[in-house]
């Protein structure tokens, strides 16, 4: 029996044990979760910086990396709502203990809102400023109400996510 078959049997066992309770698969190979997990992490953990320290990029393909987590979320978007609900990991709005730029935080949170079904932050929202609260409300609304979400890849490797919100076409352009 292959490792993949063993993993699939383990997921079937978990599904049987959980019955109708929802399962969020985190760390499970994405294909073995098809139809068995209700939600599944689609990439690596995000980091408090953009792409981890330089030497980790030399040794570890699968590592903590906000950049790589975003790449996985975008490139595995077709699984969302088909195989399971996608969990792109958390986003950050906070300033303390976070080295992401304001633009990087906006990209991370907006991509998570548009392309995932699990929308979580590791921040403590009670500490948010009024501006951060307003941004959280905007993102929450985006996660719940955005329609016709489409992703395009430009020749230069940049992404453009187009979506409709309140009857208007909006877009987010970014490069990883």
Predicted regions and their residues:
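Active-site groove signature of glycoside hydrolases
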Residues: 1
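Glycan-recognition surfaces
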Residues: 4-5, 9-127
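Polar/charged alpha-helical tracts
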Residues: 12, 16, 102, 130-145, ...
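A generic structural motif
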Residues: 25, 53-54, 147-155
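Short, charged low-complexity intrinsically disordered segments located at boundaries
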Residues: 41-46, 139-149, 165-172
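Carbohydrate-binding surface patches
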Residues: 102, 106-120, 152-176
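Aromatic- and carboxylate-lined catalytic core of secreted/periplasmic carbohydrate-active enzymes
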Residues: 109-153
């Amino acid at each position: 029996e292959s490792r993949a078959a063993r993993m699939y049997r383990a997921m079937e066992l978990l599904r049987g044990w959980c019955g109708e309770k929802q399962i969020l698969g985190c760390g499970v190979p994405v294909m073995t979760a098809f139809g068995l997990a209700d939600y599944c992490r689609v990439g690596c953990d995000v980091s408090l910086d953009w792409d981890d320290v330089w030497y980790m990029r030399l040794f570890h393909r699968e590592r903590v990396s906000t950049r790589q987590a975003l790449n996985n979320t975008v490139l595995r978007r077709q699984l969302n709502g088909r195989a399971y609900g996608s969990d792109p990991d958390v986003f950050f709005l906070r300033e303390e203990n976070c080295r992401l730029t304001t633009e990087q935080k906006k990209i991370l949170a907006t991509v998570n809102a548009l392309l995932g079904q699990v929308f979580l932050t590791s921040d403590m929202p009670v500490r948010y400023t009024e501006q951060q609260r307003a941004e959280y409300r905007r993102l929450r609304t985006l996660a719940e109400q955005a329609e016709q979400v489409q992703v395009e890849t430009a020749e230069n490797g940049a992404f453009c996510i187009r979506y409709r919100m309140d009857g208007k076409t909006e877009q987010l352009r970014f490069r990883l």
